[in-house]
Amino acid sequence: MELFEKLKLIRQAEGLTQRELCDATGINLSTWKSYELQRRKEVSSLELLKITGHPQFKKYTLWLMCDEAVPECGQISPV
């Protein structure tokens, strides 16, 4: 699964709109939309840090980066 696809799954798992996620993380809404519409497939390191560093989304870091989940350590998958 591509990184941009994982980002959409995380947003959906949290029940957030694109705008809500962008407001929470500081990611530009048009940038986020370009990921979800697959116009932009490479996610910048800055955006990755905004997601993985946010308290609401830290639990997805291992899955986002390595396709692994360790629930006993608080690292889960949205699917």
Predicted regions and their residues:
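A short, Lys/Arg-rich alpha-helix, primarily the initiator
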Residues: 1-14
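Conserved hydrophobic/aromatic packing and binding residues within compact polymer-binding modules
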Residues: 7, 21, 32-35
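Residues within the helices of the helix-turn-helix
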Residues: 8, 19, 49
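The alpha-helix within a helix-turn-helix
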Residues: 11, 22, 52
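Short, charged amphipathic recognition helices of the HTH superfamily
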Residues: 14-19, 45-46
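Recognition helix of helix-turn-helix/homeodomain-like DNA-binding domains
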Residues: 26-43
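DNA major-groove recognition helix of helix-turn-helix/homeodomain DNA-binding modules
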Residues: 44-62
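Short, charged recognition helix plus adjacent turn
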Residues: 61-79
